[in-house]
Regions:
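Short glycine-rich or small-residue beta-strand-to-loop segments that form or flank ligand, phosphate
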Residues: 114-121
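N-terminal, polar/charged subdomain of small-to-medium soluble alpha/beta proteins
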Residues: 14-114, 129-132, 136-180
Length: 180
């Protein structure tokens, strides 16, 4: 499917067999996504020695201000395209790794998950690094914006700022992932 033709639909809650790269308005299910990723890796005959998951959740405070809730917006066709780019970058950097990325949009309350990333690899180090790399690249290139609502006002948090093809940005993400 060409992501620029009418764009994909916002997906419902995660169900088994759903795309491993998704934008959804429904609650995220990290365990189900990780299990589906593991099944896909195993079905290809590849060994899976470790699965690492990252769950980003809405925190109660930001820079000393009490957060009431967040609203996420995304340019969905391009966000999914950026997830696919990240998936390709992970495959080049860690050939034995596979990833899944789901990001939520819409209104999220304190403690709700906004993003889940699962990374599977033949060894734990690669799974950790691929997972960390993916979240850093999402922050750099995915057109997803966060609108924070506080007790005393509201603010937009700057979204993606790096050029998708910026090697320096990719290197920063690799360096951060190496510390995972």
């Amino acid at each position: 499917m060409d992501l620029w033709d009418k764009g994909p639909k916002v997906l419902p809650a995660y169900t088994e067999g759903m795309s491993l790269l998704a934008i959804t308005r429904q609650p995220l299910r990290a365990e189900a996504l990780a299990a589906d990723l593991e099944r896909q890796v195993q079905s290809r005959g590849e060994g899976c020695g470790g699965i690492c998951t990252f769950l980003g959740v809405v925190r109660a405070t930001h820079q000393g201000r009490r957060v009431r809730y967040l609203e996420y917006e995304a340019f969905e066709p391009l966000a999914l395209k950026s997830f696919a780019r990240i998936e390709s970058e992970v495959a080049r950097e860690w050939p034995a790794a596979a990833i899944a990325i789901h990001h939520r949009i819409g209104r999220l309350e304190i403690g709700e998950a906004s993003v889940v990333i699962a990374a599977a690899a033949s060894h734990r180090a690669e799974a950790f690094q691929a997972c960390r790399y993916a979240i850093e690249r999402i922050k750099q290139i995915a057109p997803i914006w966060k609108h924070e609502f506080f007790d005393d006002g509201e603010a937009w948090v700057e979204g993606a700022t790096a050029d998708v093809d910026d090697e320096a940005a990719r290197q920063r993400a690799r360096d951060i992932a190496a510390c995972a």
